[in-house]
Every structure is written in structure tokens, then in C-alpha cells.
């Protein structure tokens, strides 16, 4: 009788383990394939917003980049999450923490020549599939070329990783200005097709999770698979919008004064 009870007990343990394993697989499947739809209260939105310091740093970085590239006749456009922010929020997405822009391959050498100007403003410059301009926050400059009727990344690894990140000829040009917080930036002529490819239902829902969202380490697996219904609070851009420094003109003025002083001394 004791031997029979032991066998039954062993079978029960095996059965329980199988049930638990099946439950884990089912839960994993749900997380991978099923999206949750949630409406956040205004108070809950604050949980996901980037800090005010980070927002100010991002706007300053975008302002400095816009002014340096424009001053040096390098045409650029905002793209990816930065473009989504300009279209949907008229500024930085409140839970985004970097900036993305593109330039044409023909302007890459010119860009390389002016990178020291970013360093004069206190930014560090590096390259890994894109040019990275960083201080407290980072901006990526992607290099693009035209292939048939599409503008695509020149970097093959980026093309393979983000096959939907492209513009058709009529979508990109002519570039136009977008409101971006308290400043204006350049972006594509018609962004809708590009946004639809990258962010389906972007005009109805926001997805908080991004692999580089370092300010959100607390996100649960469920939150990562949640589409948050857009509310007026969620549509507000990252804040504050300013005040922003006039760094590019200040550096240029300082250089002019030094040159003038050197001439005067001679």
C-alpha cells in the first residue's frame, strides 16, 4: 500500500509540474502575441515621463544640431521617434530619451568636417553605424542614400534591422519645418506613410517601451506589451520646453572676438 501511495504521489508531482510548465508557456505566449489596451490617468502618465532635466537637454541638443547643420548648409530631417514626436506631440515624445535625424550620403564628408564644432559646444562625437552626438543625452545622425525610388540607410546592418525605416521620394522632399517644443526643425514633406510603416496605429495608441528607454527600468513584461490609448495628457510633449541657450551664436561670437583681438594686437 505504501509503495502504491508513493507512485501516486510521484505521478501527482509530475502532473503538477506539467501544469505549471504549460501555464508558463501560455503566459509567455500571451505576452509575446497579445497586446493589452489601457487608458492612463493623468497621474499615471507622470510615471513614464522623462525628467525635466533630460527633456531640457534633448531640446538644447536638437537646437544646437539644427543651428550647426543649417549654418553649414547641411540639409537634415528628423526621423523615427523624433519625427513621431513632432507630428503627434509637437515636441519630444514624453517618454522618449534620444533624438534621430538623417542626412544624405553626399553631405557625410561635410558633416565630418564640422564635427569639431559639436565638440566646441561640449558634446562628444562617436560613430557606430550612425554618428552619435552626446552630452547628457544623445542624438543619432543616420546616413541615407537613394536607391530606385526609396531613401534608405547606407549601413547594411541598419537596413536589415529596420527594413521599414525608409522614405519614398515623394514622402521626403521637399523638406518642411515642424514645431518641436519652442523651436522649429526640418522634417519630411509627407510623414504619414513612413510613420504608418514604423508605428502602426501611432495616431491612436502610444507604446511606452523601447529597448533604449533607460529611464524606464521598472517596466513589467505586461507594460512592454501594452498600447496606451492617447489622452490629452499623454499627447503633451516632454517638458519643460525651455529656456534654451543660444550656444552656437555664443561660440561664434567668442571666436570672432578672439580673431579680432589677435588682429588688433598685431
Swiss-Prot record:
Subcellular location: Membrane
Topological type in the membrane: Single-pass membrane protein
Domain of life: Bacteria
Keyword presence, Secreted: no
GO molecular function: transferase activity
Predominant cellular place of this UniProt entry's protein: membrane
Keywords assigned: Membrane, Transferase, Transmembrane, Transmembrane helix
GO BP terms, alphabetized: glycoprotein metabolic process
Ranges annotated as spanning the membrane: 13-33
Gene Ontology cellular-component terms listed: membrane
Keyword Transmembrane: yes
Family: Belongs to the LicD transferase family.
UniProt xrefs under PANTHER family: LIPOPOLYSACCHARIDE CHOLINEPHOSPHOTRANSFERASE LICD
Name of the molecule in the record: Uncharacterized protein RP689
Organism this protein belongs to: Rickettsia prowazekii (strain Madrid E)
Lineage: Bacteria, Pseudomonadati, Pseudomonadota, Alphaproteobacteria, Rickettsiales
Amino acid at each position: 500500500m505504501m509503495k502504491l501511495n508513493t507512485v501516486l504521489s510521484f505521478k501527482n508531482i509530475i502532473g503538477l509540474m506539467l501544469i505549471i510548465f504549460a501555464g508558463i508557456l501560455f503566459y509567455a505566449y500571451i505576452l509575446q502575441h497579445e497586446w493589452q489596451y489601457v487608458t492612463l490617468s493623468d497621474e499615471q502618465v507622470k510615471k513614464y515621463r522623462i525628467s525635466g532635466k533630460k527633456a531640457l537637454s534633448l531640446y538644447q541638443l536638437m537646437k544646437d544640431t539644427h543651428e550647426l547643420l543649417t549654418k553649414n548648409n547641411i540639409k537634415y530631417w528628423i526621423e523615427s521617434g523624433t519625427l513621431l514626436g513632432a507630428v503627434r506631440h509637437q515636441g519630444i515624445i514624453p517618454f522618449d530619451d534620444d533624438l534621430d535625424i538623417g542626412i544624405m550620403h553626399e553631405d557625410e564628408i561635410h558633416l565630418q568636417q564640422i564635427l569639431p564644432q559639436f565638440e566646441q559646444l561640449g558634446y562628444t562625437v562617436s560613430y557606430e553605424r550612425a554618428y552619435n552626438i552626446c552630452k547628457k543625452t544623445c542624438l543619432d545622425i543616420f546616413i541615407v542614400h537613394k536607391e530606385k525610388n526609396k531613401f534608405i540607410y547606407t549601413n547594411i546592418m541598419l537596413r536589415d534591422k529596420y527594413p521599414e525605416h525608409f522614405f519614398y521620394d515623394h514622402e521626403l522632399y521637399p523638406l518642411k519645418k515642424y514645431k518641436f517644443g519652442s523651436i522649429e526643425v526640418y522634417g519630411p514633406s509627407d510623414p504619414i506613410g513612413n510613420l504608418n510603416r514604423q508605428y502602426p496605429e501611432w495616431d491612436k495608441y502610444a507604446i511606452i517601451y523601447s529597448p533604449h528607454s533607460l529611464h524606464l527600468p521598472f517596466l513589467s513584461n505586461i507594460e512592454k506589451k501594452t498600447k496606451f490609448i492617447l489622452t490629452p495628457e499623454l499627447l503633451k510633449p516632454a517638458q519643460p520646453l525651455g529656456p534654451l541657450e543660444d550656444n552656437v551664436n555664443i561660440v561664434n561670437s567668442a571666436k570672432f572676438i578672439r580673431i579680432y583681438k589677435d588682429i588688433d594686437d598685431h
